[in-house]
Amino acid sequence: MKKEPKIVMIYLNNAATTLFKPPEVIKAATISALSVGRSAGFDATAERLSALREKLLKLTNARDHFVVLTPGCTFALNQAILGLAARLPPCRILVTQAAHNAVLRPVYALAKRRFPCAINAADEFGRVTPTARSTARTSNQKTGNNPTPKPPYEAADNGFSYGVVPTDEFGRVTPETLAPHLTPDVKIVVISHMSNVTGGIDDIAAITKLLRSRGIYSIVDCAQSVGIMNVDLSNIDIAAFPFHKSLHALSGIGAMIVREGIEMEPLVYGGTGTLSADKDMPDFPPERYEAGTHNLPAINAALAALDWLEKYEEEIRGNLDYIGKRLYNGLYDLYPKVKILSCDNPGAIVTFVTTDTDFDSAVFAQSLYDHGFVVRGGLHCAPLMHERLGTSLSGAVRVSPGIDTTETQIDSFLLTVKRLISP
């Protein structure tokens, strides 16, 4: 029986996770995995952790901040949103239509009282103290004020609420479009630096300047931007990003950049290697937010990735820009059968639909897979963005080349799309 020739897959889903990992990264992770594990308390490990934090602060120009290492970007965003809210009196949180579910779902959970925040236990400056929490608990016990638990998804009564700020068609907001939504009860605004659907980029410097002038905390989701462009986080309060995307390191590690002086409740409690006799977590960062054993192979891989990125940064970004424009222009030439949803400066994200009335992004993505191309169909974990685009039912096809994507591969992809949309 004659065997079918094996299709060599071309990976174009780098916005989800980058396929290419530099040899230095693989080597660092392998050596670390094969070595005797050492906790953060050992000098050599402490030096590696300190070096990684310092490199991240330099990369993001965040000198007045500290770095919290997390199991990933989703964890970091949960820690930022829920941990910060737990230190505030009941308030309103704003997200944008570009928000990823890693932002939306923690906010929804908070508003539906599915996260234990310290309600009505703040001082006059909005700070929650152990004494205030204890007083609130004692008062509730004396008065019998123990509210009956409400079933999931019922309207909240804890005072927290959220609002969605409309974006333009590329998922962008500006200080001018954001300002009317900044009512006195808004205390946290979560911004998506780069849309994972359209590649649209927000001016976070201008936005966070506005928020700071109003005394509002800023949380910035930098999952798509760090590594692919210069990112200046000097004005933000909290930012989160992973290492497995454009930093070309491993999954299982993320980072949270936090302005000095900002306090949050920890999301996870456990051993830190410091103050082990205390019943509570240490009250100083980053240990307060880093319970448990660090992912040392991923940390060593991240260090190697940052060294590699610093060496080849200009070459990497130049290639991505060229390949991204070639992809965008090629799909643009297929109009009107193909409609591009990305902005005309898409970086490495180009998302499209076809004008076929029966278009289904999952089916189209599968057809591309059958022809040897890995792309991403569906809603991309950004349902509000697809509502804005009118693609909630069909979804869209996202194509995200990487630094190792060639002109030949892009041209082959474009030819395949053309054949699939032809009658």
Regions found by a protein language model. Name each.
Residues 1-142, 146-423:
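Pyridoxal 5′-phosphate
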